[in-house]
Amino acid sequence: MTYSDGTNSGFSRRNHYVGQPAVKVGSSNFDYYRKPEKSHGFAKRAAFFAYFPLLILWLETDLKIASGFDVIGGFAFTFLFTIVLSAVLVLLCSFSKRRGVNRGIATVLTAALTIWYGVQMIYYNVFGTMVVVSSVTNGGAGQAFNSIDMIMTAITSRIVFVVLLFVPLAFFIIFGGKLFDFSKVKLKGKLIVLLIAVAFQIGTVLAVGIDRDSSDTKSNYNLYYGELQQVAVCERYGLYTMQRLDISRLMFGYKANIRTNSKPKNKESTADEITKPEQKAQIMSADFSKLTKSTNNDELKSLYEYFDSEEPSYTNEYTGMFKGYNIIFITAESFSQYAIDKDLTPTLCKMYNEGFQFENYYSPAWGVSTTDGEYANLTGLIPKSGVWSFSKSAENNVSFPFTLGEQSRKLGCKTVNAYHNHTYDYYDRDKYLTNIGYDYSAIGKGLDLGENVWPNSDLKMMQKTVDDYINSDSFSVYYMTVSGHGGYSYNTMSERNADLVKDLKYSDEVKGYLAANIELDKAMEYLLARLEKAGKLDNTLICLTDDHYPYSLCLLYTSPSPRDS
């Protein structure tokens, strides 16, 4: 029945609720309105609030497993430290009154996080370290992926983990609209979310400080407040926290504690004290006590006091052994004892057995991979974490008077050259090698190897450069090789020497590593032959070391050496 004013009869009723939109239900003849279910809306909002913490935890866990990190040990810290980031991301997706806009922002943020974690996963797989801000700003991350083969091989080797990274993004795109509430969050709600997140952050930071008195460099406190150890921090606290610490230290600076000698220096036992008749104390003429009093700079004072507190070193039976010798210093890419084999690399084996064998010699992956290894080799110093130490030193015109290059020039050496068989400005080598006294040549700067391959041949580099100095009265030469670079399944040098290792009972990667170092062995064979022919072999000191261990073959260190089989 319908009244003259057009309203319905009493068979249908309208129920209106203050503050809630009415929802029409039923047929055209029997319409009624019901109140929306509050619990359903609350569940969708709660699900959205939980989405970003779970997303980041998923990405962190996938990255850790793919990188071989301990997942359980740092699980709690990783999760708790991401709550603030998660809260910020949720609020960024809740500012607009239009739900579609908020959902679009959430999709973009999810994609950005996924891609960034993927980049870090592949970068670590190739270089054994994480991308830090300085690598991005210096263009190093872009330079690093200088070969599409390198990228594709790294992705292929971690394809399962790469696919898993994109699972949350696919899930969000397909089901996000049904499962989550993207409506705007009121100011009061935003403040509550932020306060809860900050409370978790403060509590987690306090928990980190519990072992602040620990001397362990890998303690929770030292990892968080000490020198940034990218990989260790990423394993314990997660990638996000590592990036946050890196950015904060870049923006606000970081002052490390300078270690001082706990033993008081005996002022009477300096140059006049000789423990044995033939030993002499090696002491500079600098008066550090006077220098300490002459400056108001606290950092300089700390350094002067530290140097003044140190006991001098003394001459020994090796002092002066190589006086007047020519020097060839070689930093061999990813070199290790596993590349030394009497059958595969006989020249390296000969050099090892007839030369000095250093024990307790450790070479880490470093924070910035090869260039940090070079920095340690050529300066004798530990590189600063989070920056390109060698590049920065050249940029700031830092003097290194004790490097081989500078000392060789001081002693009147006629030829002081450095060579690299890759792009000349990679890692800014053209700046820092010249800054420490070398005349530098590389691909694109005076060195042409006649082929464009990755990596280039160490043998060809020797063949193209030895004539530059072999006839000089005295020379000091530095080489940075590249044939042993990781990615041995596609390494051109591995392929070039593949027939020599094909029958070994190892994985293709291990055989590729050995094959790549055969090219280094050929380079050493050529170098020694040229030195002998020129009559320079007996008065030339050759030092060969690595830039870092072969991190792309870290499992190699748990397997027997080829020469043990």
Question: Where are each of the predicted segments found?
Answer:
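Transmembrane and membrane-interface helices of multi-pass
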Residues: 25, 29-283
